[in-house]
Amino acid sequence: MLRTLLKSKIHRATVTDCELHYEGSCAIDEDLLDAANLLENEQIHIWNINNGERFVTYAIRGERGTGIISVNGSAARRAAVGDLIIIAAFAQVPEAQLDGFKPQLVFVDANNRVQHQRSHIPVQAAAHPQEGRPS
């Protein structure tokens, strides 16, 4: 059996451009593609933190070192310059390979420069444990 797992994530990237009349896709700075282990033409999910929009497109190379994140084509209607987004990709992993599988998580600053990277998501604690719930 194959399991679909998070493979790559660029967290809180800032949209720098929206090009409605460009071919569809999302241009991503090549430094970020490399850091997140994303390939040109790879399917990506984009989740817009500002407006809640979620959509699927594919990655294309953006100029290295520029911080470009350009949402293109019809998807440009779902984002605006300055919006914060999460870019994610998934992989189908055979169960026999699950133990060694780790996602590549990339965290960026306001200029879309890599700040740090991780290969795990920490356990989320309850913000306000409810009284009376069993432990």
UniProtKB/Swiss-Prot annotation:
Residues of the active site are 25, 58
Q: Which reaction does it catalyse?
A: L-aspartate + H(+) = beta-alanine + CO2
Cofactor(s) essential for the protein: pyruvate
Post-translation: what modifications? Is synthesized initially as an inactive proenzyme, which is activated by self-cleavage at a specific serine bond to produce a beta-subunit with a hydroxyl group at its C-terminus and an alpha-subunit with a pyruvoyl group at its N-terminus.
- The name on file for this protein is Aspartate 1-decarboxylase
Alphabetized GO MF terms: aspartate 1-decarboxylase activity
Q: Name one GO biological process term.
A: alanine biosynthetic process
Name the positions where substrate binds: 57, 73-75
* Annotated keywords: Autocatalytic cleavage, Cytoplasm, Decarboxylase, Lyase, Pantothenate biosynthesis, Pyruvate, Schiff base, Zymogen
Q: What is its main location?
A: cytoplasm
Cofactor, free-text remark: Binds 1 pyruvoyl group covalently per subunit.
